[in-house]
Amino acid sequence: PTQLAKLRSHPPDLAVIFIGANDIIRRRRPAEAVGHLREVVRELVGAGTAVVVGTCPDLGTVQPIGRPLRTIVRRASRQLAAAQTIAVVEEGGRTVSLSDLLASDFLAQPEEFFGPDRFHPSAKGYAYAAAAVLPSACAALGLLPEPAEQPAADPSQDLLPVDQAAA
C-alpha cells in the first residue's frame, strides 16, 4: 500500500510485480493475497499504467525444504499462480508464469540460481526472472509487437476459459 500511494501522483508507464513466494511461506490465505493483488492491478491499470505480474514461483524447487513439505509448497505455489493469473488478466494486466519458465533451471542448477541462503534467487536467478518478463513488458509498452493474431480456432479443439487455462 505504501509503494502504491507513492505512485498515485505520478503513475508510471509500466509496473512489474513479482509476487507470491512470501504469501506461501507466511501461509497467507490465497483469497486474501489474490484480492490484494487484484486491487493493486485495478488501481494501476485505472491510472493508465501497464502491469506485468511474474506469478508465484515454484517453491518446490527450494531444496532445503524437505519432502513431503516440498510437494505441498509446489502445489500451493502453482495454485496461487493460477489464481493470480485469473485476477490480473480480469483487471487488464498481463502475467508471466515464472514457475513454467524457470523451475527447470532452478532445479537443474540450484547452486547457480539460488543465493547463499538457498531460498532467494542469486543474481543469475534474478536476471533470468527479469529476462522472462521482459518480452511481455516491452509488448505492454508497445516496444514489441503483440503476438500475431491467431488463426481461427480449430473447431475440433476446445478453447478453455482463462480460469481453466491458468490451472
Predicted segments, located by residue:
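Alpha-helical cap/lid subdomain in secreted, periplasmic
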Residues: 2-149, 153, 159-167
